């Protein structure tokens, strides 16, 4: 008799995705981050759902409702800081996941890669809107500054910004719609994740060598399920440590001051995971140019498959490309640091240099080094 997991209409979908899925035998721990992102998404949806039961999206009561959650709701403080720090964990896993894709050439599966870029944009939008909800100083001014960037779009600028605000400034209408979208987007992200997995399972996973592994496959369960569970435990331990010992570590002190349109904070900045893009935005003196650079800093990932010039898929056997890749990582760390600094000398010039390097490495140096490596292979 055939096992029910192979015949039942629902169970066979789960079986072919997580149990009998053929997986390359050489996958390293860098392949754990996809499943870790799934756990992060689950934690975010659950904690967010319970917080939404107590939160009020009104400018008069939003800040107080968050205080009420932390003080009066059973384990409300835990839910709030799991959500806030869970977002940081989400982005750590997300950036490592994208970095893995760049290093090992996973972007050659173009459908999976493009859905991944869509997912990145959706998660960034969700996080931005979530940061506005506590209605602290940085929430209000962050929303004002970022939504104002749309005024750089010619001809429709004023109409577009006021349409998004729902009025002539960031106010009650803005907060209400941001809450509605913040609640909705994680479910759209979940749907996109399913499409992401659908396309991935069409082609099968890449592996560290970048060489087709069809002759050497192993079942996903028990080998990679056990490996994933170890990853879950490590990540959840790190998250619990952060939440229980230093929940305020990654937040901004200004966001514990209620929003006041009459007082501007000394340094308006987003959460740490957006600082690299914020630094690129600020490095260009022109408003429209800055907005285009900001969008391109993420959208550039979409043209990475086109720029792949190497005869090898992975960087595993390409030492010159490896050096460039780690230089790119160093540039991203530099941009993240600069994004949190005030706009003054020497931070301005460092930010501009790092921004130029970021685009230069991806657009020119990587393809050129790949061609050099191709030539050296012949030699």
Swiss-Prot record:
Its cofactor is heme b. It comes from the Eukaryota. The chain crosses the membrane at residues 33-53, 77-98, 113-133, 178-198, 226-246, 288-308, 320-340, 347-367. It is found in: Mitochondrion inner membrane. The keyword Ribosomal protein does not apply. Gene3D superfamilies: Cytochrome Bc1 Complex, Chain C. It is a multi-pass membrane protein. A ubiquinone binds at residue 201. PROSITE patterns: CYTB_CTER, CYTB_NTER. Binds 2 heme b groups non-covalently. Keywords: Electron transport, Heme, Iron, Membrane, Metal-binding, Mitochondrion, Mitochondrion inner membrane, Respiratory chain, Transmembrane, Transmembrane helix, Transport, Ubiquinone. One of its GO terms (molecular function) is ubiquinol-cytochrome-c reductase activity. GO terms for cellular component: mitochondrial inner membrane; respiratory chain complex III. The keyword GTP-binding does not apply. Heme b b562 binds at residue 182. Heme 1 (or BL or b562) is low-potential and absorbs at about 562 nm, and heme 2 (or BH or b566) is high-potential and absorbs at about 566 nm. The cytochrome bc1 complex contains 11 subunits: 3 respiratory subunits (MT-CYB, CYC1 and UQCRFS1), 2 core proteins (UQCRC1 and UQCRC2) and 6 low-molecular weight proteins (UQCRH/QCR6, UQCRB/QCR7, UQCRQ/QCR8, UQCR10/QCR9, UQCR11/QCR10 and a cleavage product of UQCRFS1). This cytochrome bc1 complex then forms a dimer. Component of the ubiquinol-cytochrome c reductase complex (complex III or cytochrome b-c1 complex) that is part of the mitochondrial respiratory chain. The b-c1 complex mediates electron transfer from ubiquinol to cytochrome c. Contributes to the generation of a proton gradient across the mitochondrial membrane that is then used for ATP synthesis. This is Cytochrome b.
């Amino acid at each position: 008799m055939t096992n029910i997991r192979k015949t039942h209409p629902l169970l066979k979908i789960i079986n072919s995705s997580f149990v009998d899925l053929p997986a390359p035998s050489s996958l390293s721990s860098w392949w754990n981050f996809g499943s870790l992102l799934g756990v992060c998404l689950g934690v975010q949806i659950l904690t967010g759902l319970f917080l939404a039961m107590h939160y009020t999206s009104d400018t008069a009561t939003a800040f107080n409702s968050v205080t009420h959650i932390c003080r009066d709701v059973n384990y409300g403080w835990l839910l709030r800081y799991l959500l806030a720090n869970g977002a940081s964990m989400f982005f750590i896993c997300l950036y490592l996941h994208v970095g893995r894709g760049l290093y090992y050439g996973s972007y050659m599966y173009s459908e999976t890669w493009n859905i991944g870029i869509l997912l990145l944009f959706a998660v960034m939008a969700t996080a931005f809107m979530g940061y506005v909800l506590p209605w602290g100083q940085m929430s209000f001014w962050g929303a004002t500054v970022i939504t104002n960037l749309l005024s750089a779009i010619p001809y429709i600028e004023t109409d577009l910004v006021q349409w998004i605000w729902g009025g002539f400034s960031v106010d009650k209408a803005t907060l209400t719609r941001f809450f509605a979208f913040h609640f909705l987007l994680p479910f759209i992200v979940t749907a996109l994740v399913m499409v992401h997995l659908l396309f991935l399972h069409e082609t099968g996973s890449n592996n560290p060598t970048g060489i087709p592994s069809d002759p050497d496959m192993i079942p996903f369960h028990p080998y990679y399920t056990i490996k994933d569970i170890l990853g879950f435990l490590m990540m959840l331990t790190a998250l619990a440590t952060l939440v229980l010992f230093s929940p305020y570590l990654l937040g901004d002190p200004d966001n514990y001051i209620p929003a006041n349109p009459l007082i501007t904070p000394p340094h308006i900045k987003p959460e740490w995971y957006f600082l690299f893009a914020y630094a690129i935005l600020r490095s260009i003196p022109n408003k429209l140019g800055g907005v285009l650079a900001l969008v391109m800093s993420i959208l550039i990932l979409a043209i990475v498959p086109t720029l792949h010039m190497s005869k090898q898929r992975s960087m595993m056997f390409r030492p010159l490309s490896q050096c460039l890749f780690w230089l790119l990582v160093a540039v991203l760390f530099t941009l993240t640091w600069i994004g949190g600094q005030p706009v003054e000398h020497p931070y301005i010039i460092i930010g501009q240099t790092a921004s130029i390097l970021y685009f230069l490495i991806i657009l020119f140096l990587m393809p050129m080094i790949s061609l050099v490596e191709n030539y050296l292979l012949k030699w």
